[in-house]
Amino acid sequence: MKNIVITGGAGFIGSHVVRLFVNKYPEYHIINLDKLTYAGNLANLKDIEDKPNYTFVKGDICDFDLMLKLMQDYKVDGIIHLAAESHVDRSIKDPFTFAQTNVMGTLSLLQAAKIYWESLPEGYEGKRFYHISTDEVYGALQMTHPEGIPAPFTTKASSGKNHEAYGEEFFLETTKYNPHSPYSASKASSDHFVRAFHDTYGMPTIVTNCSNNYGPYQFPEKLIPLFINNIRHRKPLPVYGKGENVRDWLYVVDHARAIDIIFHKGKIAETYNIGGFNEWKNIDIIKVVIKTVDRLLGRKEGEDMDLITYVTDRKGHDMRYAIDSRKLQKELGWEPSLQFEEGIEETVKWYLENQEWMDNVTSGDYQKYYDNMYSNR
């Protein structure tokens, strides 16, 4: 049996990865390590919590002694590292916490893995440290075509008539790092540490940089779930600047699929970009979300457009992110399965049908669930 630690497994992306691995690989023991900060929620995994190949461990990746004990106690063969502080606005207000968790936490985990794996007779053979990062480490791309041009590459799941590019440059795996926010700077630093442990000690590592994710179980401080909830309750929709900033979007289930493929088939010491093969201006996304929520709630489609409220732009707000995922597509055969419009439809339906989850997360009541389930164990 392989013993795999997934850090941040109670979070948004992490919970989807944990669920996929627990269900797909019954011969694996999946250890979900999560500190359970505000964005971690064990209720995300109620459907698999009693599976025999699943274990939850509450812990902080910054606690080196705990990380080493975890490696030794569970005889860990692989690590999928998702635990991170990830909200840009929070990083602007509190950069220290982001450096502590994203940089020092990653270093703590790397060092614990190094010590344990090097103590084994087989050393690093059959081991793997997979670090999940962001496309924000690359900085910003110019929006040279604000009117949109035909996208130079596509997939079956690329957004139909709206599949456009807003510039001629894209982030490649070889693009130089140029982070602009405390969040992206902390992730860039952690990426460098992971690669340094391969180059210096021979640790088998892989790094991926992914575009914006959306889908079920995302904490409602992020754009799409926040706006779904606000539209439902007819609250203002704060839009930075003119809403012209461009992002590439990926449905979270497709990201989990990519992580699975890369963990098992990716080449050691390689970097892979993971993206949705689409670009959207923020204001256009918001309009799609409004129309979808209105329609599914039985309102006149688009009647809540007046909720859009333009606010002062974020400091250092990067104009355009656009990721080229063709390396992953060509080498490992992965590509997104859902068009953006299809993913938004599924996402809006989920949030509207799971209002209790939303209410519990925003009120903090989900912490009671953890206490009831684990405090006496």
Can you describe what each PLM-predicted range is?
Residues 1-213, 263, 282, 346, ...:
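N-terminal Rossmann-like NAD(P)+-binding domain of SDR-like oxidoreductases, especially those catalyzing
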Residues 4, 17, 30, 59-62, ...:
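C-terminal substrate-binding subdomain of Rossmann-fold SDR/epimerase-dehydratase oxidoreductases
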Residues 41-44, 94, 219-223, 285, ...:
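Residues at alpha-helix caps and immediate loop-helix transition turns in enzyme cores, especially N-
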Residues 43, 142, 218, 250, ...:
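Short, well-ordered secondary-structure micro-motifs
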Residues 74, 84-85, 170, 215-216, ...:
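Intrinsically disordered, low-complexity segments enriched in polar/charged residues with Gly/Pro
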Residues 179-186, 216, 220, 224, ...:
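The catalytic Tyr-centered alpha-helix of NAD(P)H-dependent dehydrogenases
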